[in-house]
């Protein structure tokens, strides 16, 4: 017997995450940044510790709003810099690292979590 809570639980598939990544690449390409999601990021998007599941619209929103507010500033940072993308309205936190691949920066999302009062020593970019 299928339980209602199992039907409501909406996991983000790897295919959906790839589509989100392609969409965000088009936005961030304007400042020379390629968005990358790791396997761990995918696993953590669907982690039950998030309480409320993280959905694709929330991921798009945080990256799009961070781009609008800080895109040019982030594109001027140096290779290897770690930073935290933070959405205050959804409590979503995305620690990322910038890596130069020879032609553009890769913004590699190491993980993602929904957590109030997330602590990090890296520079925070909040929306």
Show which residues each predicted segment covers.
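Ribonuclease/tRNase effector modules and their secretory precursors
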Residues: 2-127
